[in-house]
Amino acid sequence: MAHGRRVERVASMIRREMSELLVNGVRDERVNQGMVSITNVVVAGDLQHCKVSVSIFGSESEQDQAMAGLRSAAPYLRGELSRRLNMRRTPELVFHHDKGLAQGVEVLGLLSKLEEERQERGPVPDGSEEM
């Protein structure tokens, strides 16, 4: 079992190389049509499995197609990582669609809408805020 520092270092190297491969290595149009970015890489302590979280900009169908493209490109990506990182055993890649960015934008939109409604109502007469 690898130590924490090694696991973190391997995750960092995988993230860097995966970012490069997504831009220059993957030729699958499903992946290239949406804007795909890696948000997080988590490597298991035994260095056998790697969870790659990706954020995908585009419509729902484009996001689904990009995820399908990433899953089909996983063996190619793993092989490229093996060549580039020179590891004895390259972790198996599992892709996860990270919807946190889209949810964050949605929350910010709701907060803006609430602020607009509050400004339309004007100040509360007694000086205290409503709950």
From Swiss-Prot:
Keyword Cytoplasm: yes or no?
Answer: yes
Disulfide bond positions: none
**A Gene Ontology biological process annotation?**
maturation of SSU-rRNA
Per UniProt, subcellular location reads as: Cytoplasm
Tell me a GO cellular component.
Answer: cytosol
Family annotation (InterPro entries): KH_dom-like_a/b (IPR015946), RbfA (IPR000238), RbfA_dom_sf (IPR023799), Ribosome-bd_factorA_CS (IPR020053)
Family recorded in the similarity comment: Belongs to the RbfA family.
Against PANTHER family, the record matches this protein to: RIBOSOME-BINDING FACTOR A, CHLOROPLASTIC-RELATED (PTHR33515:SF1)
Supply the name of the protein: Ribosome-binding factor A
Recall the taxonomic lineage recorded for the source organism: Bacteria, Bacillati, Cyanobacteriota, Cyanophyceae, Synechococcales
